[in-house]
Design a protein with these regions (language model features):
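A membrane-topology feature that recognizes alpha-helical transmembrane segments
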Residues: 1-230
Length: 230
């Protein structure tokens, strides 16, 4: 552990404090300028952009939920940032089939800060850092390869993949593999359902961003917790 003198209660407090500060910072950024980023993507897709109030309120609620859900995770800033900004980015992708680069960068910053906080308060900081690096590769390599195929993954998915892989990889390599598989399975089920109900054809592209972000958050929060309940 980088800081060996921290008692367990202080480690818990630092995790909660870092999560709360992340909640404040993300909301402040969205209120000041972050909310504007999505406007261009919706306008170019001839759709109505989201309002600032809708974005900030939604992000605040999502952040509050994940603040409670992720309080036992040492890398809370990463979880909070991906949850709050990722939810917005996922919605943009679902509507426009594009992932805003600025939101991906913001999530990457949050994941890095989460690794730093986790390194300070976790006795397994070396394993977490190595897991994040390998997790980023586990997610990046297959999605980058699929990007080269006709009709494959989009460029935004390739940029987002290592960010999410690092987040869930810091929990464990098995978690990273599980979350990646979950994202593809979920997207496949969603695509099949749309075909069955007649809302899409066999050549309709499914936006992967929402499934990647959702699967990464599920893997990060639930891995090592849910199996103990079963």
């Amino acid at each position: 552990m980088i800081v060996t003198w921290l008692p367990s209660w202080l480690s818990t407090d630092l995790s909660l404090i870092s999560g709360f500060l992340t909640w404040i910072v993300v909301l402040s950024w969205l209120w000041r300028s972050g909310w504007k980023i999505q406007r261009r993507y919706f306008i170019e897709a001839t759709q109505k952009p989201l309002t600032r109030n809708a974005i900030v309120w939604s992000a605040g609620i999502v952040g509050a939920v994940f603040f409670v859900a992720a309080q036992m995770r040492p890398g809370m800033p990463g979880v909070m940032t991906v949850a709050m900004i990722g939810a917005l980015s996922a919605y943009v992708d679902a509507r426009t089939h594009r992932l805003p680069n600025a939101y991906t960068v913001a999530m990457a910053i949050g994941v890095v800060l989460g690794l730093v906080v986790g390194g300070v308060i976790s006795p397994l900081w070396q394993e977490r850092l190595l897991g994040a690096l390998i997790g980023a590769l586990i997610w990046f390599v297959p999605i980058a390869l699929l990007n080269r195929l006709p009709g494959g993954m989009g460029g935004g998915d390739v940029k987002l993949a290592p960010v999410l892989g690092a987040l869930v990889g810091s929990v464990g390599l098995n978690a990273a593999i599980f979350a990646l598989a979950l994202s593809f399975v979920s997207a496949g089920v969603a695509a099949l359902w749309k075909i069955v109900v007649g809302s899409a054809g066999t050549k309709t592209r499914v936006p992967m961003g929402p499934w990647m972000i959702g699967a990464a958050l599920v893997g990060t929060i639930a891995w090592g917790v849910v199996p103990d309940w079963l």
